[in-house]
């Protein structure tokens, strides 16, 4: 059985991989790392660092993974159900593992742990209990083998009665079993919209071992992976991008109206329903253990990081909703019980709004409207009253009343000024998150264009 997987399963180093696509670079293992009894792991460190990407130097070249099974069973004439044992191997070509045996002491094979190399996203259900413990690297050919004979996940029954010609009955039973296997697996093949079953062919041969003759049934299963990115773009990227754009447009709603938070809750609920509906369309390998955590739109090459991209979109929506709730609460507290803005926060706000660097608010002009009076500005002192101009009792009462009115007016002005500062700070936070949204959308579009062209 042969599997074609175009490109890497993940793009952990997206920027590096896009820059080095198609350059034809190869990695040659240094021979000083090869000893008489062992190989220094540092010699393969450059290969281990690239385990997140496909073992190719040009992503337009497909990686061919050949899967072979060895089935064996001990037939029991008194048993109706026979359980088969299997041993499978998956060799593929790794362009990063290369060395010259003549210069490396004649060493042609080296074993290494599976966690250090790229693994093909092909899983044999119920074939082995766990992932093989090691790989065998043999001159750019990597083989993933299971060292133990494990039980296969399917069983076949063949029942015949002893007769004059038991070999004919046995051959007839083989034909019945192969026919049922072929029909059953053709109808129950689960594509998950990722794999296409090309066909199942079988042939029966006779094998002679010593003086005994055995019949062997060989099945050739051909599958192909869907390489077209159009279904993923239409089903996943376009609806998700539309919902993200709608959530970004909600930043234009005024925070004081109180309609921003309910609108974002509705969009978040709609995106959650979209993820639940698309759960059945996601490939079975979208949550692979060796999937990348970067490159959210790498499903143009392979659908592995689709779940990561959706998680990033959902995180942005949740963060936007929490930020809206926090700003609404901040505005409510600022209008009911205004507190003075901290000095460091005031300096940061002046730094942002003074030059128009990161906040869309306009700088204050002049000293119009309520504000601090000139007598409370730094460096300005109140005029002194001379001894000859002391006010009388009636004038003192009028002066005291005017001072109380002025103090009350100054207190209201300071309160209003504090409210304005908190409002400016809230709008600055809202503008910062809006720019983060725009940055994420721009990077997503650029990544889609780059991956589509490559």
Swiss-Prot record:
Gene3D superfamilies: Neurotransmitter-gated ion-channel ligand-binding domain (2.70.170.10), Neurotransmitter-gated ion-channel transmembrane domain (1.20.58.390)
Topology with respect to the bilayer: Multi-pass membrane protein
GO cellular component: neuron projection; plasma membrane; postsynaptic membrane; serotonin-activated cation-selective channel complex; synapse; transmembrane transporter complex
Protein keywords: Cell membrane, Glycoprotein, Ion channel, Ion transport, Ligand-gated ion channel, Membrane, Postsynaptic cell membrane, Receptor, Signal, Synapse, Transmembrane, Transmembrane helix, Transport
Cytoplasmic side: 254-264, 328-431
TM region(s), chain numbering: 233-253, 265-285, 307-327, 432-452
Localization per record: Postsynaptic cell membrane; Cell membrane
InterPro entries xrefs: LGIC_TM_5-HT3, Neur_chan_lig-bd, Neur_chan_lig-bd_sf, Neur_channel, Neuro-gated_channel_TM_sf, Neuro_actylchol_rec, Neurotrans-gated_channel_TM
Catalytic reaction equation(s): Na(+)(in) = Na(+)(out); K(+)(in) = K(+)(out); Ca(2+)(in) = Ca(2+)(out)
Cleavable signal peptide: 1-24
Ranges in the topological domain labelled Extracellular: 25-232, 286-306, 453-454
CDD domains: LGIC_TM_5-HT3
GO terms of molecular function: excitatory extracellular ligand-gated monoatomic ion channel activity; serotonin-gated monoatomic cation channel activity; transmitter-gated monoatomic ion channel activity involved in regulation of postsynaptic membrane potential
Annotated spans, HA-stretch: 399-430
An individual GO BP term: regulation of membrane potential
Quaternary context: Forms homopentameric as well as heteropentameric serotonin-activated cation-selective channel complexes with HTR3A. The homomeric complex is not functional. Heteropentameric complexes display properties which resemble that of neuronal serotonin-activated channels in vivo.
Protein function: Forms serotonin (5-hydroxytryptamine/5-HT3)-activated cation-selective channel complexes, which when activated cause fast, depolarizing responses in neurons.
Family according to the record: Belongs to the ligand-gated ion channel (TC 1.A.9) family. 5-hydroxytryptamine receptor (TC 1.A.9.2) subfamily. HTR3D sub-subfamily.
Domain statement: The HA-stretch region of HTR3D seems to confer increased conductance to HTR3A/HTR3D heteropentamers compared to that of HTR3A homopentamers.
Name of protein: 5-hydroxytryptamine receptor 3D
């Amino acid at each position: 059985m042969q599997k074609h997987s175009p490109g890497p399963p993940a793009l952990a180093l997206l920027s590096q991989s896009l820059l080095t696509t198609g350059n034809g670079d190869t990695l040659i293992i240094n021979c000083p790392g090869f000893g008489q009894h062992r190989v220094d792991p540092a010699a393969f460190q450059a290969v281990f660092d690239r385990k997140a990407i496909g073992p190719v130097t040009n992503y337009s070249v497909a990686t061919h993974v050949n899967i072979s099974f060895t089935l064996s069973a001990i037939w029991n004439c008194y048993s109706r159900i026979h359980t088969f044992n299997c041993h499978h191997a998956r060799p593929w070509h790794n362009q990063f593992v290369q060395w010259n045996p003549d210069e490396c002491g004649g060493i042609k094979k080296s074993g290494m742990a599976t966690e250090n190399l790229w693994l093909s996203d092909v899983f044999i259900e119920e074939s082995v209990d766990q992932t093989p413990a090691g790989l065998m690297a043999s001159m750019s050919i990597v083989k993933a083998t299971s060292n133990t004979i494990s039980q296969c996940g399917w069983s076949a029954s063949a029942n015949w009665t002893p007769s004059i010609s038991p070999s004919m009955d046995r051959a007839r039973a083989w034909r019945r079993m192969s026919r049922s296997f072929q029909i059953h697996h053709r109808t129950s093949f689960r594509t998950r919209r990722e794999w296409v079953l090309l066909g199942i062919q079988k042939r029966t041969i006779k094998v002679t071992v010593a003086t005994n003759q055995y019949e062997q049934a060989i099945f050739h299963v051909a599958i192909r992976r869907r390489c077209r990115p159009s279904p993923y773009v239409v089903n996943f990227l376009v609806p998700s991008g539309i919902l993200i754009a709608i959530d970004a447009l909600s930043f234009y709603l005024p925070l004081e109206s109180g309609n921003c938070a309910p609108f974002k809750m509705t969009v978040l609920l709609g995106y959650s329903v979209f993820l639940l509906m698309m759960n059945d369309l996601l490939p079975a390998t979208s949550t692979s253990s060796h999937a990348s955590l970067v490159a959210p739109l790498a499903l143009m090459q392979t659908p592995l990081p689709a779940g990561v991209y959706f998680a990033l979109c959902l995180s942005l929506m949740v963060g936007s909703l929490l930020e809206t709730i926090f700003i609404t609460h901040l505005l409510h507290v600022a209008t009911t019980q205004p507190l003075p803005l901290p000095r460091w926060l005031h300096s940061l706000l002046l730094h942002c709004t003074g030059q128009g660097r990161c906040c869309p608010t306009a700088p204050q002009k002049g000293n119009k409207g309520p504000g601090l009076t000139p007598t409370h500005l730094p460096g300005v002192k109140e005029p002194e009253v001379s001894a000859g101009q002391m006010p009388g009792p009636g004038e003192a009462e009028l002066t005291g009343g005017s001072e109380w009115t002025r103090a009350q007016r100054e207190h209201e002005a300071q309160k209003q000024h504090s409210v304005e500062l908190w409002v400016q700070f809230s709008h600055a936070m809202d503008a910062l998150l809006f720019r983060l949204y725009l940055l994420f959308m721009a990077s997503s579009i650029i990544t889609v264009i780059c991956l589509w062209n490559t």
